[in-house]
Amino acid sequence: MNNQPKTVRVRMAPSPTGSPHVGLVRTALFNWAFARHHHGTFVFRIEDTDRERSTQESYDAIIDLMRWLGLDWDEGPEVGGPHAPYFQSERGDIYRDALARLAESSYTYDCFCTNEEVDARRKASGSKVMGYDGFCRDLSTEQRAAFEAEGRRPVVRFRMPDGSITWHDLVRGDVTFETRFVPDYALCRANGDPLYTLVNPVDDAYMEITHVLRGEDLLSSTPRQIALYAALEELGIAKATPEFGHLPYVMGEGNKKLSKRDPEAHALAYRDQGFLPEGLLNYLALLGWAIAADRDVFSMEEMVAAFDIADVNPNPARFDMKKAEAINAAHMRLLSLDVMTERVLPFLKGAGVLSDPVNPADTQLLELAMPLVAERINKLTESVDMLGFLFVDEESFTRDEADAEKLLNDDGRAVVRRALDALERVGEWSTGAIQDALQAELVEAMGVKPRNAFGPVRVAVTGRRVSPPLFESMELLGRDRSLARLRSALG
């Protein structure tokens, strides 16, 4: 984009409630990429005004997620910055001052109405306009005194201006709202606690946010915020109103908006499932943006270089788990053997396949085995099943029940018996010698097709139908362990 200000400042402002959602990650990613592309500032603040729902556990999960993904922030928790504090729960004096200044200039008014009274008036009038009806906008001194005598405590509402509000949305183009359909809205609770409707724009103003990139679900709140920004500018609190861009919905199964209840929505679960952070980010970037029409796989450096918010597609994007796994698999193929080995180690240790620390013999065996599986695993967790058979002792070795039932039947055991006889005669225990012996005995002598010949042997030795290459695996496993497993498969 050619007309960007010299200093771009964007923010991510999650609420620490519940498990972080992939929609949060997509929004954070687009803000991060936008800031990095324009050599700007990525601000991270915590919207914890909902004291009942905000938890330390959720905050820790958000920090953990951002660190794992490599979405580094320039200002915010744990790094500080010129606009600290970055927790809304610690900025109460700032919000109270803003409220007082808004009230002094008559941008707000006290509202004593109950929800029941508002609903009753709407039903009585037959109005179809939802929200507050402005009843308390111009209370007389007597009316106010009467409400106070009843012990009512008011909320503070912002006076929406007459007319219409138009802005150029960075994703959707020009958007206009008639303010008669945007009711006066509350800025704080009756107990004085500020609401999101106040603290979000006030924080953006004080932190000098230039661009607000957020989900489409917040589109309808934008005219309210633009009106509030105009007031904050008049009061000298805001230097300017930020530009807005509303990102497309992420849809789940059945073409419904992906919700926190959907299993694929939980962002940290992808780490547990063995996704690479770069693979997950690449896929989430595709939910509304593309680096090129004929290209899906790219690095974050490439995304930063190419990212333009104007290229974001406003239409809803559908979350496709198969596509996500395919993108992750492509990134797995880009890893060097050393890096892939480093990435799978925590999963192998966590599953008990390897000790912590890894003993020297297992380290050497892993280095020999990784080239066999590097092109076969699509997620880091798959290394456990693919490599586990090499490291487990014979007393703990097990076979997949379904695979054993299918391939180690009477015909399969007959193949295993002949394989055992042939391999017991092998002198040098090497990949080539193992392959030659089994090929001669099972395929040529028995006349069994290779698939039917080697499948039972594979399950007998590795425990699974899917494994690294059989002959190489048997060489790594060694003569004694390979023959022992063939014997145990015969019962």
Swiss-Prot record:
Keyword Iron attached: no
Cofactor binding comment, as recorded: Binds 1 zinc ion per subunit.
Enzyme class: ligase
Molecular-function annotations in GO: ATP binding; glutamate-tRNA ligase activity; tRNA binding; zinc ion binding
Cofactors that this protein relies on: Zn(2+)
Major localization listed first in the record, in broad terms: cytoplasm
UniProt short sequence motif 'KMSKS' region, positions renumbered to this chain: 257-261
Superkingdom in the source lineage: Bacteria
Amino acids binding ATP: 260
EC number assigned by the record: 6.1.1.17
InterPro entries recorded: aa-tRNA-synth_I_cd-bd (IPR045462), aa-tRNA-synth_I_codon-bd_sub2 (IPR020751), aa_tRNA-synth_I_cd-bd_sf (IPR008925), Glu-tRNA-ligase_bac/mito (IPR004527), Glu-tRNA-synth_I_codon-bd_sub1 (IPR020752), Glu/Gln-tRNA-synth (IPR000924), Glu/Gln-tRNA-synth_Ib_cat-dom (IPR020058), GluQ/Sye (IPR049940)
Amino acids binding Zn(2+): 111, 113, 136, 138
Entries under Gene3D superfamilies matching the protein: 1.10.10.350, Glutamate-tRNA synthetase, class I, anticodon-binding domain 1 (1.10.8.70), HUPs (3.40.50.620)
Catalytic activity: tRNA(Glu) + L-glutamate + ATP = L-glutamyl-tRNA(Glu) + AMP + diphosphate
Keywords: Aminoacyl-tRNA synthetase, ATP-binding, Cytoplasm, Ligase, Metal-binding, Nucleotide-binding, Protein biosynthesis, Zinc
Motif ('HIGH' region): 14-24
Any Pfam family: tRNA-synt_1c
Record's subcellular location: Cytoplasm
Gene Ontology annotations of biological process type: glutamyl-tRNA aminoacylation
Function of the protein: Catalyzes the attachment of glutamate to tRNA(Glu) in a two-step reaction: glutamate is first activated by ATP to form Glu-AMP and then transferred to the acceptor end of tRNA(Glu).
Assembly, per entry: Monomer.
Family: Belongs to the class-I aminoacyl-tRNA synthetase family. Glutamate--tRNA ligase type 1 subfamily.
Protein name per UniProt: Glutamate--tRNA ligase
Provenance organism: Nocardioides sp. (strain ATCC BAA-499 / JS614)
Gene: gltX
